[in-house]
Design a protein with these regions (language model features):
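Flexible, glycine- and charge-enriched loops at secondary-structure boundaries
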Residues: 33, 133-136, 178
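Non-catalytic protein-protein interaction segments used by genome-maintenance enzymes to assemble
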Residues: 96-142, 207
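Nuclease catalytic cores
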Residues: 5-52, 92-93, 220
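A non-catalytic, helix-rich entry segment at domain boundaries
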Residues: 35-101
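An active-site-proximal "capping" alpha-helix that borders the catalytic cofactor pocket
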Residues: 137-149, 158
Length: 234
């Protein structure tokens, strides 16, 4: 399995939801926040790459597969708040890197929305309704670590840009910050791989190997009712 921040973050918040989605392959419905995020990201990416605004918005709607709740007005409004300009940087930079130097190291991949200043600055656009601090999780720290590996830069200024509020949360990630994020990812990746091996030997013990962690996230989880039935007898 190739890991990503979102996979690791999901596992940390609820191993059972991770199991349902990434081990059993159960698809989750495309919600409005997810579809809107995809549309806005595509519109901003196209704008930076020189596409005219109206065409960029249309491409965003196509990217979201014309989700019935996503409107061109919402996509245009949020994309415009990014202040994106043609040529301001490289967009959607994809990376796949080993998390350590061992032969069978877990692999981490990611897509960075915007890279500029020769890899020493990155931005991740957010359509969230609630802003948070860039250090509240390890997403941007991992992206900064990837920039360090790819561009050999001594530091990376990482920014979350919350489009609804035109609000930034930034931090200058030094090697120690990058290492902290890498170790977090490596620890979880190794834990998941160990559990996958155990599940391969004892599939009937899936409830103990990948337990559910009840939280406020259950309100938005498509597996919540099934989860309640599954774990009520444990």
């Amino acid at each position: 399995m190739i890991f990503s921040f979102s996979r690791l973050n999901l596992y940390e918040s609820c191993p059972y939801r991770f199991f349902k989605k990434y081990v059993l392959g159960n698809e989750e419905p495309i919600t409005l926040p997810l579809a809107l995020g995809k549309a806005v990201h595509k519109a901003i990416e196209d704008t930076i790459n020189g596409v005219q605004h109206r065409e960029a918005i249309l491409n965003g709607l196509i990217e979201a597969e014309f989700h019935p709740e996503v409107t061109a007005e919402d996509v245009s409004f949020l994309a415009s708040r990014s202040n994106a300009k043609p040529g301001m940087g490289k967009t959607e930079i994809h990376f796949i890197l080993p998390l350590d130097d061992t032969e069978d190291a877990p692999m981490l991949q990611g897509y960075i929305d915007l890279v500029f200043n020769k890899g020493m600055a990155i931005t991740d656009w957010k359509t969230n309704r609630v802003p948070y601090h860039v250090l509240d999780n390890h997403q941007v720290g991992l992206y900064a670590w990837a920039m360090n590996k790819l561009y050999l830069v001594p530091y990376v200024v990482g920014t979350l840009y919350f489009l609804r509020f035109k609000k930034k949360s930034s931090h200058c990630f030094m090697p120690a910050d990058m290492e902290k994020a890498r170790l977090w990812a490596l620890g979880l990746a190794n834990e998941i791989n160990a559990k996958l091996e155990l599940y391969g030997m004892l599939p009937e013990e899936f409830k103990r190997i990948f337990p559910a962690i009840p939280s406020s996230n259950c309100r938005h989880c498509p597996f919540a009712k099934e989860c309640l039935r599954t774990f009520s007898a444990v």
